[in-house]
């Protein structure tokens, strides 16, 4: 495995291999046992997965990682008289075997060698000498094997009560563990898709999220809707932290003093490191709608909004959080024909983390119209016309690392034909 890691580096170091190839080979075995009896639901699931992730080519920013994950899960659902109680339990055993990549600086010639040849060339050959020894200071990536393993337990329970035949109320409690991914542990290199030099951390701890949510739903005749609020307390929340400008300047000064400035610059990319910190997430989702029976067909309109606030326990904002959104959907159906109009208003995101910039709000207007025809019970033809971003508005996704360089797509109009048989 160590030799394989070196081969990945040698391919990526020269930047001459062509396109990057992301390989993810996985083998998974799952066994499910249903122990239900009558209205009492009992299920047990055992899942075993082996996965190998490798990245080869010019953008080979992570040595191969082998992961083994074994999961034992249990689910039950019972009518406890005044409500329905759902319980889920899960035990995970995770092991990831990868490599820690570190940059190693080498000199091709020692000082004694240089002194012996100091006078061998006259001034006419000084330029040639400099060119011949331009690569005396080489940078090589060294790989040391490392294994991460952990055993974690998660539990969730939901109590759901029907208030009447049209409305219900549910309360959910959960404590969920998430081990660091292969990327979060072993990433080390240029990730051109995000314009960053990303660095993982093999010392990351397992995340634990303690959650509570309350939801209300109703569907009465022509009116329907739902509302939910939630609070998540995440210990050891894992995220990518961008290097600040002043930190970059300080590192560049240090690298200049050490005569290794090229490495400190990271090829002009932003240095972004996986790190973790305790965080709180609070949010809500609300939707209300109405149906109208027309002389021909049915018309439905829905209005919704969602918003989340995420802060670290020291009061700083969590980076790349989705801004508040308002959505209006109108849908018309008649037999095999349907049409939909979606207006999505994304608000300005001003609650930004250190190093982030404010993202302006935008409004997207999308439309679809489709007609289908069934030739028989198993064959159906569907013709769809669609339009995205009808107003051709410039819009940027606040959660994207490259929001300033790559805006969301502009106006897009097209037709799709689908034949299912």
Range-by-range predicted roles:
Residues 40-46, 85-89, 169-171, 225-227, ...:
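Transmembrane beta-strands of outer-membrane beta-barrel proteins
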Residues 36-40, 80-83, 162-166, 209, ...:
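Outer-membrane beta-barrel channels and translocator barrels
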Residues 230-234, 245, 251-349, 391:
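Gram-negative outer-membrane beta-barrel transporters
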Residues 50, 93-107, 136-137, 141, ...:
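Surface-exposed extracellular loop regions of Gram-negative outer-membrane beta-barrel proteins
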Residues 1-108, 136-139, 144-162, 168, ...:
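Face-selective signature of the C-terminal outer-membrane beta-barrel domain
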Residues 235, 350, 371-421:
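C-terminal beta-signal and adjacent terminal beta-strands/loops
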Residues 29-37, 72-78, 157-161, 214-220, ...:
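Residues on the lipid-exposed face of transmembrane beta-strands in outer-membrane beta-barrel proteins
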């Amino acid at each position: 495995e160590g030799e394989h890691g070196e081969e990945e580096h040698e391919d990526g170091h020269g930047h001459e291999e062509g396109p990057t190839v992301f390989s993810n080979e996985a083998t998974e075995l799952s066994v499910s046992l249903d122990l239900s009896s009558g209205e009492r639901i009992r299920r047990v699931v055992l899942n075993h997965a082996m996965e190998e992730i490798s990245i080869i080519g010019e953008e080979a920013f992570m040595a191969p990682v082998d992961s083994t994950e074994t999961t034992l899960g249990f689910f039950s659902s019972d009518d406890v008289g005044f409500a329905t109680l759902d319980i889920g339990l899960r035990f995970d055993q995770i092991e990831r075997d990868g490599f820690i990549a570190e940059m190693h600086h080498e000199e091709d010639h020692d000082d004694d060698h240089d002194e012996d040849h100091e006078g061998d060339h006259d001034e006419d050959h000084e330029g040639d000498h400099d060119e011949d020894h331009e690569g005396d200071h080489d940078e090589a990536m060294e790989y040391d094997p490392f294994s991460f393993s952990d055993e974690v337990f998660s539990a969730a329970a939901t109590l759901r009560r029907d208030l009447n035949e049209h409305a219900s109320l549910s309360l959910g409690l959960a404590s969920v563990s998430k081990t660091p991914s292969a990327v979060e542990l072993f990433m080390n290199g240029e990730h051109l898709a995000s314009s960053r030099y990303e660095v993982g951390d093999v010392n990351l701890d397992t995340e634990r999220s303690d959650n509570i949510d309350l939801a209300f739903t109703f569907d009465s005749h022509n009116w329907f809707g739902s509302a939910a609020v939630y609070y998540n307390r995440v210990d050891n929340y894992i995220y990518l932290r961008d290097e600040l400008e002043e930190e970059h300047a300080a590192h560049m000064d240090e690298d200049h003093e050490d005569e290794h400035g090229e490495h400190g610059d990271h090829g002009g990319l932003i240095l972004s490191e996986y790190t973790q910190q305790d965080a709180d997430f609070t949010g809500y989702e609300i939707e209300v709608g109405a149906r109208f029976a027309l002389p021909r067909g049915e018309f439905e309109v829905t209005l919704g909004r969602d918003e989340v606030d995420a802060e670290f326990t020291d009061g700083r904002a969590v980076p790349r959080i989705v801004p508040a959104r308002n959505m209006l959907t109108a849908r018309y159906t008649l037999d095999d024909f349907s049409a939909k109009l979606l207006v999505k208003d994304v608000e300005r995101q001003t609650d930004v983390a250190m190093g982030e910039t404010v993202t302006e709000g935008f409004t997207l207007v999308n439309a679809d119209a489709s007609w289908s025809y069934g030739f028989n019970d198993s064959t159906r033809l569907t013709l769809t016309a669609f339009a995205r971003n009808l107003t051709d508005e410039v819009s940027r996704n606040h959660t994207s690392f490259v929001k300033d360089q790559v805006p969301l797509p502009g106006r897009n109009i097209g037709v799709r034909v689908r034949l299912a048989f």
